[in-house]
Amino acid sequence: MFKKLLLALVFSAGTFLWSVSSFADGHCEGSTMNDGHTGGKYPQQYELSEYQSAAGCKMVFAENPNIVSINDTIQGNKGLAAVADRLPDEPLVVVPYDSIGSYGGTIKFLSNATEAGTSDMLSTRHVNLLRFADDLTTIVPNVAKDYEWNSDFTTLTFTLRKGHKWSNGEPFTARDVEFWYEDLMMNPKIREKPYPYLLVGGEPMTVDVIDDVTVRFNLPSPFPGLTATIAWSYNQFFMPAHFLEQFHPEIDSNA
């Protein structure tokens, strides 16, 4: 069951974005980089309100026409709610280069390390709080809405998206980040030793929940490379606390 709990991120279960303007016919086509919409605070992406202001359009949402039948093939999945109910209150808008893609077709790809049981392509199915932009240099928000360092790179604060949900409809909150780090990754009963990339100078960080949509990493020493670690890591920096806490004996006495 746990493996079915996915984070309903930007396009939520096959959702994509179209823009709707005040033109006489009520519609305008989706924008691309060629239309001059190159990004807001971060390259090639906007917050919804930011995009609507820049493009002079109001967005409406559509979905993969086959998503309901695909969802029904997974045993135990609930029926899908309406598109608007699946999206967070603050969805991310990613601007395509040339056109909005079409559903269907076959993708072919090469893998450099199949003998290691990994797949270059399949590894991209996971999303994290941050990601690298297409220039492979700029680090931009992904699951997170925004992030900010303090002046000496010892605290990293994430702002999450209001109304963000897991695939079962439960809220995705700062507690999911704290639970992942403090209760799972730093728990010696679960991992004898923490992963080196989760330490700074060999010392653990701490994670504080400021409110439901604000979470802060406190570092024992300056480490500006943490954002790059989060952006490239295959391992997600959050777990569904609402589901996993029932199996954690230090949290639930019935576990």
Residue positions per predicted region:
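Bacterial N-terminal signal peptides
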Residues: 8-17
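N-terminal lobe/hinge region of extracytoplasmic solute-binding protein
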Residues: 67, 74-151, 182
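Extracytoplasmic/secreted proteins, especially bacterial periplasmic and envelope-associated proteins
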Residues: 65, 69, 124, 142, ...
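Surface-exposed binding/hinge segments that line
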Residues: 196-255
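N-terminal pre-domain segments of enzymes
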Residues: 25-104
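N-terminal signal peptide c-region/cleavage motif recognized by signal peptidases
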Residues: 19-21
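Bacterial N-terminal signal peptides that target proteins for export
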Residues: 1-9
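Aromatic- and charge-enriched surface segment that lines or borders ligand/interaction sites
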Residues: 146-191, 216-218, 226
